[in-house]
Amino acid sequence: MGSVPEAEPVTISFRPRQLSKQPSLDVTCCRRRNWDYIHIVFLVFWSCVNITVFYVTYQYYKHEAKFFYLRDMLGVSLCLSRGSASVLNLNSAAIFLPMCRTLLVKFRGTKMTKRFIRRGIDRGHFIHVVCASFLLMATVVHVVAHICNAIHFSTNFNEEFSEVNVATFKGENPCKLILTTLAGVSGILMVLLLVMISLLSVPTIRKHSFQLFWYVHHCFPVYYLLLLSHSLGGLLKEQCNVQTHVPGCTMDVGAIPEPVWGKEDMIFTENSTSCIETPKFIPHRSETWCYVLIPILIYLADKVWRNLQSRYPVIVQSVIFHPADVVELEFEKEKFKASPGQYILLMCDKVSHIEWHPFTLTRCPTKCNPTFTIHIRVKGDWTSAVKELLLEQRHRNIEAAATSIPRFFVDGPFGGSSQDVFKYNTSVCIAGGVGITPFAAVLNELRMRASLGNLKLRSLYLIWICRQVDCFQWFAEMITDLYWKLWRENCPDVLNVRLFLTGNSTPNLSTLPKFLLKRVSLGRPEMKTIFQEIAKCQTKCNNIGVFVCGSSKLSTRVYQLCRSCSTKDTKFFFNEDNFA
């Protein structure tokens, strides 16, 4: 790997080039670590929904007359398998919706979307994980129940009415019933696929083997094909002539009589109705498509729209190599619109055609300047490969570089919680290292605005924690420009900047502008003191937005302070952006 200069940034400029077609795929997760009332409300709500669906389905199969003979063979395992199947179908459908990024961005941006809804949308990854968890729990119950069903089909063979049987004779090996039927084989494949997806989704494994996680996760179309075909074999039978053969009639049909309503304490054989024919059975119709059809269509429409928007490479206007292994890329894309706090998915075709990585916009396009920028922290195989490709251009002339630089494709933009910075009178932005990127877009927005008069935001606190002093140079010029702009407009109190250095070595602060130099403190910030100070200064502000982008430890600490420092008069609203 080539070395990155530690002093002055190195800039490479490229002229616009001809766009060409290129398909794309995406993968990203926006991670929310801390439990707040949004998490709890959704978890309680979704638990109630799943319990209700399970209970209603369980009772239906327990008491419905057309399942009497099937229920007589399988017992309670029939009800458990069908109840868990409904929960499984429900979550297989719901798990799609948090991944419809374009739809959620449009919905989040409407004026009708209240804060509670926006905060829920920002927790799309949490909702996705909750649905996956219920899906796995339902799968376990469903598998165990169907193993019991296979055993009961073998031991409780119905010799009177052979149509209702799955086994061909009494005592047939249950394993054979599972391994030689469409339902059994497709079920085994689905379980294996879900286990692989779940194991590779563990944060530790995903972090170190992201490509493997991505490949396996994108096998989900196979899962849904198996899910839709799972019941096509028609193993479970339901009675289709309940009107002419009422379960519980006195006709010798070889079964225990039961009235239509299925109450065991109300069975009276001597008063039961006589039947005029034997029971007839048809395969039980699948209900899976009723659950998943609409969510799949919504997801496909969202996916097609995103692919259409990201099929052309963007124009690379410039590349800047910053200290501390950070690369700044400036792009231009036709009709690209974004707002501060949003992020994009980036793909470099010379590195991988399938890997898309999330990066927060550090400067959004405007009417005067249609370009936008991102800052990439070189950490990992993909970012290292991108850096190597860009470094190669430093040894070529501009004409050659313009035609040989790697092509980049952009998907998005997508929403993040930092979009709400301007929706509060007072906002506190807390960043750890490269977590400054979403707030850089906010600062750039303030810098580029002609006037701040129409903004709701009146006070912005920026707390930036870094280990190296070089990190502050990423946005030192921009922060200084904003400060002088506010000073000229006679509103310097709008921006309050506090920088903290946590490294062990003695820092060299001489490279920083005087404005930032006066605001640097050594050591970790006393967050509780800062929160108390903000609450004391903002007595006229009831709601204060707190936005965090950094390590899990930092986010947890800030979340706890938002709860402990909130009073009846002043409430701190916690928001987190973190990309896994």
Task: Indicate residue ranges for each PLM-predicted region.
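Extended, low-complexity, polar regulatory segments
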Residues: 1-33, 116, 371, 500
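Membrane-interface recognition of transmembrane alpha-helix starts
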Residues: 22-64, 77-94, 126-143, 178-191, ...
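Juxtamembrane membrane-interface segments at transmembrane-helix boundaries in membrane proteins
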Residues: 23-38, 66-87, 116-127, 157-188, ...
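Membrane-embedded alpha-helices of multi-pass membrane proteins, especially ion channels
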Residues: 46-75, 89-110, 134-156, 167-173, ...
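Classical protein tyrosine phosphatase
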Residues: 93, 125-149, 432-463, 568
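Reductase modules of NAD(P)H-dependent flavoproteins
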Residues: 242-275, 368, 374, 379-383, ...
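Membrane-interfacial segments at transmembrane helix termini in multi-pass membrane proteins
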Residues: 285-321, 329
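Ferredoxin-reductase
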Residues: 314-405, 467
